[in-house]
Amino acid sequence: MTEQKRPVLTLKRKTEGETLVRSRKTIINVTTPPKWKVKKQKLAEKAAREAELAAKKAQARQALSIYLNLPTLDDAVNTLKPWWPGLFDGDTPRLLACGIRDVLLEDVAQRNIPLSHKKLRRALKAITRSESYLCAMKAGACRYDTEGYVTEHISQEEEAYAAERLDKIRRQNRIKAELQAVLDEK
C-alpha cells in the first residue's frame, strides 16, 4: 500500500488547473418597484387628484354663487298667471309695461293676494330676464298692462338694450353651465 498513494481528504483542497479569478460586482437593475411602494404612490396620487378636484369644485362653487338664483320661467309664469292673466298670452309672458312692479304691489295690497314682495319681485325678474322675453323686444312691439291692454311700444333704444342683455345672459348661462359641469364631475 505504500506504493500506492492513497488520497487524503481535507477540507481545504486545492483543485488542479483552476486559478482564482476575481469577479466584479454585478449590478442588477430592478425595473419594478416593490408592491408596497407602488401602493403608496397610487394612494398619494389619488389623494393629490382628490385634493385638486375638491379645490376646483370649491372655486366653481364660489364662482357660481355670485349668480342670482331665480325661479324658472315656468314657475314665474305659474306664480303670476292666476292673479294677472292679462300679462300672459297662453303660457308665454307678454312684454310688460314700464313700472308694472309698483302696480302689481299695489294690486297685491288692495286684493289681499297671498304673494310676498320677494316672490313677486323674483318672478318678474325671471320673466324679464328670460331669453324668450328679451327676444320678443323688437322695435314697435307693444307693452301690456295688468288687464292686457296696450300701453306703449318698444323703442329702438330698448331693442338695443334688450340685445345687449340677451348677449350678457347667454354668456352668463354658458359660464354657469361650465361651472356646473365642474361641480357635477366625479
Curated annotation (Swiss-Prot):
Coiled coil: none annotated. One of the components on the FinOP fertility inhibition complex, which inhibits the expression of traJ gene, which in turn regulates the expression of some 20 transfer genes. The transfer genes are responsible for the process, called conjugal transfer, in which DNA is transmitted from one bacterial host to another. RNA-binding that interacts with the traJ mRNA and its antisense RNA, finP, stabilizing finP against endonucleolytic degradation and facilitating sense-antisense RNA recognition. It comes from the Bacteria. Belongs to the FinO family. It comes from Escherichia coli (strain K12). This is Fertility inhibition protein. Keywords: Conjugation, Plasmid, Repressor, RNA-binding, Transcription, Transcription regulation. It holds the Pfam family FinO_N. GO terms for molecular function: RNA binding.
